[in-house]
Amino acid sequence: MSKITKIIAREIIDSRGNPTVESEVHLEGGFVGLASSPSGASTGSLEALELRDENKDRFMGKGVEKAVSLINEKISIALKNKNARNQSDIDHIMIDLDGTINKSKLGANAILSVSLAVAKAAAASKRMPLYAHIAEINETPGVFSMPLPMINIINGGKHANNNIDIQEFMIQPISAKTVKESIRIGCEIFHALGELLKEKGMSTTVGDEGGYAPNLKSNEEALNIIQDAIQKTKYKLGQDIRLAIDCAASELYNKNEKKYNLKGENISFSSKEFTHYLEKLSQKYPIVSIEDGQDESDWEGFLYQTHVLGNKIQLVGDDLFVTNKNILKKGIKKGIANSILIKLNQIGTLTETLEAIKTAKQANYGVIISHRSGETEDASIADLSVGTSSGQIKTGSMSRSDRTSKYNQLIRIEENLGTKYAPFHGLREIKSAF
């Protein structure tokens, strides 16, 4: 009942109006899994490769017809009659068929869409939710927890057309007792921020991830406005709400000058200076998490930052680790960062993603499951966060259905499992001393 009978791939549109790959996996017994691949804007250089057509006559060269053809003509043949419940076997067949380190032959976007669709079809054949099937693949059957959200309310950097250099300013509702309550708190603060921006005559347009994207004088002004917005609600910054930022510092780094340039403020920092700039921000505001606070290749800078901030702040490696267990192991050995951001399409299969999560947990690193700036309505990351008890999720703001689809799935899962079987640990999930 779980043998793959056919795979159909197609080109669909993501949240930025760019093409991406969707795969439909059919099993004996009529079970079907449907999944699509997301796409990033600020990407790590060691991420698995996203295959694009490069045909300027279609979608400005961003079409994915090649990837679709490779699924329909090669991957589908290689996987026909294979058991969809053997996720590792399925993924390794595709990895071997590709034969490259970075999945450049078949494309991570092609491989991932099939990998996730296989998992969904297998879950359907077992008549269980995706999160429960993922827990079984992860060898943690029946073990679940609900993640604390990182809710992006101001977008900057490559995620918005504005002058803010830090890419994401996020809130974490630490006083919430359930994920549903944390989402409600996030919504209330999001709307309070929107009203405040209107009062100040600022733009309330949103960026790629649904957060507001106003032009501001500095990164500190963004933090001040968030602080003011929270004061308009019944919540207290520091007590109910903590802050998180994603610097995406690789996008700020000039390799020739070895400087981090904040163009919006017209200031530059050396590696150590940038760490101390972030340290001052975290002393002035209740920032509990800093993502990619150095360039991905500046491991000495990351090591220094970890020595300075690692005992107080959650230091998250995104471009640094690219969901790659081998790179993560090197970072763990060197004592770099204390948490990892998990993005399925950085590595390209569900199996390798689960391996990265296991590696992080074994080293007591924090785990944050993440979306990409180019998303679809696929809500698999919600199930992934629950099925691996990852503890935190980062999936954008409280606008744009490509973001809210994940929050809504978390609400459904929590309702289905109840707090007894899927506890919400809140602040305890953050690798921070606060």
Swiss-Prot record:
InterPro entries: Enolase, Enolase-like_C_sf, Enolase-like_N, Enolase_C, Enolase_CS, Enolase_N
Gene Ontology CC annotations of this record: cell surface; extracellular region; phosphopyruvate hydratase complex
An individual GO BP term: glycolytic process
GO MF term set: magnesium ion binding; phosphopyruvate hydratase activity
Cofactor requirements of the protein: Mg(2+)
EC number(s) stated in the UniProt entry for this protein: 4.2.1.11
Pathway: Carbohydrate degradation; glycolysis; pyruvate from D-glyceraldehyde 3-phosphate: step 4/5
Keyword terms: Cytoplasm, Glycolysis, Lyase, Magnesium, Metal-binding, Secreted
Positions that bind Mg(2+): D246, E291, D318
Enzyme class per UniProt: lyase
Disulfide bridge map: none
Gene3D superfamilies noted in UniProt: Enolase-like C-terminal domain, Enolase-like, N-terminal domain
Function recorded in the entry: Catalyzes the reversible conversion of 2-phosphoglycerate (2-PG) into phosphoenolpyruvate (PEP). It is essential for the degradation of carbohydrates via glycolysis.
Record note on quaternary structure: Component of the RNA degradosome, a multiprotein complex involved in RNA processing and mRNA degradation.
Entry-linked PANTHER family: ENOLASE
Family label: Belongs to the enolase family.
Protein name: Enolase
Organism this protein belongs to: Buchnera aphidicola subsp. Acyrthosiphon pisum (strain APS) (Acyrthosiphon pisum symbiotic bacterium)
